[in-house]
Each structure stands twice: as C-alpha cells, then as structure tokens.
C-alpha cells in the first residue's frame, strides 16, 4: 500500500483534505444567510428544520454523492492512492455505490421529513462513526497518514455529532412531524 508520510507531495492538497469541512461550514452558513434574507415565523422548530435541511443536503447529500460516489466509482485509482488503499479493487466501486445511496437519501430529505429524516440521520451517522473508527485504526495500526485517511477521521466524527444534535433539538422542539415527540 502507498502511505503518505511527513512532507509527501500529496499531503499539500489542502482542497482535497477539507471538502467535508467546507460542506459542514456551508450547512452552517447558508441557513444563517437564508434566515437573514427572508421573513417568516422563525420559531425554534422552524429554524432547526431549516438547519436540518441544509445539513442533509450538504453533509449527507453532497458528501455522500459528490465526494463519495463520484471519486470512488469514476476515479477509483486516484481515490485509492489518496486514502492509502490498493488500486484496482472492486471494493472501491462498492464503497462508491454505498456513498451514492446515502447521498441520494440526503438530497431526498428536502422532500421528506419525519421518520425519513430520522432513518437517514441514524444510518448516515452509523456509517460515518464506523468510517471514523476505520480511519483511526489505519492511522494507529498502519501509520496511514494519507490525506484522505487522516483528515476524514475528524470530520467523520464531527458531521454525525452535528446532524444528530440538530435532529435531537428538532425533536425536542416538537419536530419530526409530531412523531416521537418527547413528553412535556
């Protein structure tokens, strides 16, 4: 396997290493802009709903489809090198389809809410926490500091924490279409 270490030339690809952070920042900044330029009854529940929609679109949809599916399926060898995986494995294709499926679900959250949001958030978070554990394991056990292995260990933890935290706050505010409402 190829592993990026120290001052490896690939380590300087800052744009590639921060894509998940950019998506997370967009999912935070765009709803703030949305709130600033629109009027409406901005209750706590409505604000949380808005943040959730942006989080599903950017942190699940874009990350899964644009930055998971497309690289793993159409640029598999380059993605493998950046992660520190062997080239030519069908596993890349399988991972890409998996990411693409979650990406589609993230985009669909614009049209569906309630239990669909809950299932999407829990499933995506389970995958992301598992991916974070895999990245950390690769770092500890194999010294794999390849750009696409090291940095995702952080974002694959932060994104699901943010998404689940938003969903929990939305639920507490009476969201999820009134389903699973907490006792008051």
Residue positions per predicted region:
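Membrane-helix boundary elements
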Residues: 66-88
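Hydrophobic alpha-helical membrane segments
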Residues: 98-102, 120-136, 158-162
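Hydrophobic transmembrane alpha-helical segments in integral membrane proteins
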Residues: 12-33
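A loop-to-helix transmembrane entry motif
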Residues: 56-61, 85-101
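Membrane-helix boundary connector in multi-pass membrane proteins
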Residues: 110-120, 133-150
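Non-cytosolic membrane-interface motifs at loop->transmembrane helix junctions
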Residues: 81-90, 144-155
């Amino acid at each position: 396997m190829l592993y990026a270490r120290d001052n490896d030339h690939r380590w300087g690809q800052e744009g590639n290493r921060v894509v998940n952070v950019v998506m997370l920042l967009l999912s935070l900044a765009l709803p703030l802009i949305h709130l600033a330029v629109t009027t409406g009854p901005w209750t706590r529940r409505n604000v949380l709903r808005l943040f959730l929609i942006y989080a599903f679109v950017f942190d699940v949809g874009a990350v899964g489809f644009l930055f998971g599916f497309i690289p793993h399926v159409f640029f598999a060898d380059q993605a493998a090198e950046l992660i520190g995986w062997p080239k030519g494995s069908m596993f890349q294709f399988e991972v890409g389809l998996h990411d693409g499926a979650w990406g589609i679900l993230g985009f669909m959250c614009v049209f569906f809410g309630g239990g669909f949001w809950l299932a999407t958030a829990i499933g995506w978070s389970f995958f992301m926490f598992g991916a974070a554990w895999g990245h950390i394991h690769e770092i500890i056990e194999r010294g794999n500091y390849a750009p696409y292995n090291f940095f995702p260990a952080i974002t694959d933890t932060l994104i699901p924490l943010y998404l689940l935290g938003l969903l929990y706050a939305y639920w507490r505010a009476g969201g999820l279409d009134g389903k699973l409402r907490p006792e008051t």
